[in-house]
């Protein structure tokens, strides 16, 4: 008997091989085979994610499809492939790695749920969450009777009803966050409602899942299920008293900007594993313990964020895809055969959609949410994802769901998530509303009435450029005559594959910026918060913070839309290079350059690109300490007039001395510096108009400089464009800031355009930041809004490439 048993059971796999040269096949050993499986999974899911990117689908769709493709539904139909890559004897190792990844992923998911924020959830979000759970849960129980009578005969009735109810009522919180971010709804009112409701739904789903697991044990005695459930409750209560104080103590010893001690990280991961072991021993599931630890860890301070940074990439990128493969190996679409099976698939899918959408729609309309937004909320709340797969896999492992029911439920989850993005894009288009709101008067700094409020939208990627940017804004506020200055500080955050980059919206408030209004400002407060709050309080400038979370390929749309909605006169963008210690400029990120170019092409107002070379030093300068020398290099044309208008605004500040350099052609060289051909009467008329406007503003500058000591006017006659312009710059090389137009007009500017190495800065800006330039001052390059949507001299081919994406999106 022992011999027969030995023959029936394959020998366990050894960990490592001796190598092919000693006759070993690497895939007959556990470690090389696991490596091969991981590589195949990662490559396949990433390729699918890339292919689905134009459809703006979340990565979970690609991972689910990839898992199904590797299973018996497609590639797994080949016995040779299945035996070679996913042999049965390797599945224990594969599922162990997958569940370990799942354990830590659920810990991260718990970290992203702020219990204090849940307690502050408004009536609207709470009502939407409850309706989105109860109605689909009830309908799920109803449809489960049909399934049980047809394809799921003989299963535990109570457990089956609860599993089906949970599976149909779940909203995938992380997946919803990514969809909202992709659709640029993350920080809108509808986005905040959806996220708050989904967070409540998520917690309720875990409670129901724990109940379902307790009811689905192999022991038929209801007393055992009761003990499992009560033990789980006791674990949660005990952890609630023990875990928060310990981690609050750890968090107080971790400081912003300083590395977190390895001891704290290792101790936390050990606690996660221990709690996972305890809940597994109770009979719930190890992931439940990990999730509870994540929820209970206090979110204040840098410790929670540091944990995510340490764990997330390895778990989400390496281990978690294995869970989708383990799920895909159990999914056999071929089991769905015949009219009955496909009819049941339609029934389950319709029930899931109908319950979520109708429940959400009814409550939304009761709260007087507009119909279009209510329908959008319904489809958003219908998003499924990893949590759905977890429920289904637990049901499959516990023999509550058979192969056919499991396949039907997986396809239902895939379909409901897949349709969310296109339906929401069709139903709810906030861009339409932005276009209606798009008419406003002051789209440039240059204007007839200088007493009107100047609205600036300043953008930044990180904390490094904040001091100089604030010093620039301080210099721009003038003397607060008229309506003063209003600043919109837009934090540009890249929408990466990392869920933590998206789920920070837990902290978003009505101002739209997640890191702005943290409770209390202490030593650990973010330096960005401190800097802007200090500027707002000391300079009495109205600063309104916001955030934009988007991919670098279309974040320019967020910038332009925000400029329209906030009626900005000028958008100030950081240059894509930063200054090094030796004074040279190094590229921060190449895609920042393309963001700037796209904004130059599509901006609804004037645009400034700020080359930061340490304006005011490395710290914020208070109003009384401002002492800057600002130089405007004026050649002519609308961009130069816009730069001069900005300079005159700065000159109102008591700490600013403005020097205006006007470059004119020497009378002996008129027409000789460059040969200008006028192609038509329109260009000739425009040139005459620009020349007249230039002369008018120069006449005004002469008058101002004669009565105001803070404004100096210097006129330079040019004979050799390149040499004489460099010579003029040499005279004021010790200035703090240069203001220049991006595309200056006039004969001299045309002569130096050939030397423009950086089209977005124009010829003069490129000259000022070139290695040969004698000045190391900061530079603000300004393009005046012209109303045509054309940014000259960005290159025809480049312009076509930059705008093609936006045409496609329209």
Swiss-Prot record:
Chief location: membrane
Annotated Pfam families: CHX17_2nd, CHX17_C, Na_H_Exchanger
Annotated TM spans: 29-49, 59-76, 91-111, 126-146, 157-177, 193-213, 223-243, 277-297, 314-334, 343-363, 374-394, 406-426
Membrane topology annotation: Multi-pass membrane protein
Keywords in alphabetical order: Antiport, Ion transport, Membrane, Phosphoprotein, Potassium, Potassium transport, Transmembrane, Transmembrane helix, Transport
Subcellular location(s) of the protein: Membrane
Tissue distribution of the protein: Expressed in roots.
Role summary: May operate as a cation/H(+) antiporter.
Identification of the protein by name: Cation/H(+) antiporter 18
Native organism: Arabidopsis thaliana
